[in-house]
Amino acid sequence: MKAIGYKTPSPISAADSFVDIELPKPEPKGRDILVEVKAISVNPVDYKVRGSTPPADSAEWKVLGWDVAGIVAAVGPDVTGFKVGEEVWYAGSITRSGANAEFHLVDERIVGKKPSKIGWADAAA
């Protein structure tokens, strides 16, 4: 899947601040849902993490983006609150990979169903 990531903390003005990358498509386990990302927003946490936090493993990419709206693409075996095709919105966990990608894994317990009257960009904001 396509994603945007970085390997070294640096100012946003650096040439390699954000790099287009390819990552394996994640697979949901447990209570995770796989969301096809339709919109993300940038908040101060993204900016602060980008400037100060390296990836946990220097060989891996760090992906930001935790404010998300999208469509449930798959569910883990223990998921009870969501099904494939539902529209969702959430602020993901900073302890996990971010949503600046085509797909994002998130624990169902921090996800809400997106109101149908709200568009993708507004839902992610």
Where are these regions (language model features)?
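Short polar catalytic/cofactor-binding loops
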Residues: 7-11, 40-42
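NAD(P)H dinucleotide-binding glycine-rich loop of Rossmann-like/cofactor-binding domains
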Residues: 91-125
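Glycine-rich beta-strand-centered segment in the early N-terminal region that forms part
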Residues: 24-41, 51-95
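Short, solvent-exposed loop/turn segments that connect beta-strands within catalytic domains
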Residues: 11-15, 79-80
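Conserved hydrophobic/aromatic beta-strand scaffold that supports enzyme active sites
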Residues: 20, 25, 69-71, 103-105, ...
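Short structural boundary motif marking the start of a folded domain
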Residues: 1-4
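Short glycine/threonine/proline-enriched tight-turn/helix- or strand-capping micro-motif at secondary-structure
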Residues: 13-24, 53
